[in-house]
Amino acid sequence: MDHLHSSTAELNLLWGSLILEELTRHGVMHLCMAPGSRSTPLTLAAAAQDKLTRHLHFDERGLGFLALGLAKASQAPVAIITTSGTAVANLYPAIVEASLTHVPLIILSGDRPWELIGCGANQAIEQLGIFGGYARQLNLPTPDLRIGPEVLLSALDEQLANLDRPLHINCMYPEPLYPSEHRFDQFDSYLSRLGQWQDTQVPYLSVANASLSAFPPRDAMMRFVHGKGVIVAGTLTEAETPTELITLSQKLGWPLLTDAQSQLRQHPGAIGHIDQLLLNPRARALLDQAERVLVFGGRLLSKRLISYLAEKDWHSYWQVLPHQERLDPSHSNKQLWLGRAGDVCALEWPRSSEANWAASLISLNQSVEQDFIHHIDGGEFGEAQVIRAIAASHTAEQQLFIGNSLPVRLYDMFAPIGCCAASTYTNRGASGIDGLIATACGVARHSGRPTTLILGDLSALHDLNSLALARDCQSPLVIVVLNNDGGNIFNLLPVPTEELRSDFYRLSHGLEFGYGAAMFGLPYDRAEDMEAFIDAYQAALEHPGASVIEVTVAQDQASNQIRRMAEWIRSR
């Protein structure tokens, strides 16, 4: 009986080791782990696996977002190990975000064997399909010598090949879970069925790279560029070489309108202030002359830009996406092309017959920037002023993660022009305020580049225990908390009464973050004016680790400034 138990534990461990080895052969570099007993075969295998960088955290929700950040920054799949029960369910928000933005996360969940599900066994829930349509599913049986290792590996390979969204691999392990020794000598005959696999570094089942692309033919491009057009840059990653859009804009002679998530929002060759320019009568009249639009990416932030695209009767509407999906809530009649933005830009585009038709947009864009310099940079201390200062100081070697709700909208509206911008990250698939600290930690950990996270106070409270992840960062990670004491984005929405806004939407809390930073041993500073913020920010960028800067502002400062700037630009 003891030998049987030992064999069970060792076979569990062998399967766990085979799984992790195969993941490394599919490009997995990072493994995020939470403690638990039912995932012991995977945990022990991970401890012995020297090809993976291991990241440990006590909270599975934060762990999932850490993996998301690592995958975003590395442009490679990241694996997550959890035990059974609600530990798996806590990954759900991160998996939703990853699915909507095509980030490959691989969940390895330990589970009870099937005979212990639905019978009152401890920490046992129905884990199969727990992520619904947000993840592909592979349900592994309990380890069994009658199931050859080649069956296990080929099943893994079929799911892992060409992975562009989350994959849930559910691993059922019977007890005992802890082997007396970590040797696989007794399985030599079993493993011999793998042949040369043990002496190579490639997957057991090699699947061809499935690259789905559909580019416009030359004659279609000739017809498309014949007229007045605009180019719109939506959400783009650095891997899509978004700077090629600048070259295309210059070649066609069409203006490039940029979103906060395009990596081009601050580029001097683009019309970055499009959200505010659409308020200006002269700019809007000029833009209304456009007949054709070429959109790269989707998930636009600016409601004004979204409305502009939706309301016009376009002669031709083209959209370029790296994946086949619908990214247009207005459901416009259009032609969808598939491919990387940079690859489509590199095609032999002819020059437009109406090149430079909207050249005056450049001077209008610069005029808006001068307004921002005068009214925001030279005005009262506030959230937009801080965001502009951060964005203006960044270099191409740095990274900027912008939190949801008000911060990302302030960046989209007011970011400065003419700067060498940092690599920009957001979580705008589901646009939640959860997991932002953890995701930024993942981005910072992979690259080791100086990283700034800008987020609101409610977002920071939502993910406060992820400061434990920040504590382990070895490169500068500056967490800037814009504390306006509640959800003040609701100041911009038509809530019927101020009493309702205060009691049911804004949720003032009266908290400050110094004690939270102290709890996790992080350097902390508080800024109530621009001079104090600049001093604190420069010091934080020189600190070899994470630090917290709290910016305290009045509840209505940002919303009032947004309204004042809108009135000013309308009247110009």
Swiss-Prot record:
Species of origin: Shewanella amazonensis (strain ATCC BAA-1098 / SB2B)
Quaternary structure, from the entry: Homodimer.
Enzyme class: transferase
GO molecular function, one term: thiamine pyrophosphate binding
Keywords: Magnesium, Manganese, Menaquinone biosynthesis, Metal-binding, Thiamine pyrophosphate, Transferase
Similarity section: Belongs to the TPP enzyme family. MenD subfamily.
Cited HAMAP family: MenD
Identification of the protein by name: 2-succinyl-5-enolpyruvyl-6-hydroxy-3-cyclohexene-1-carboxylate synthase
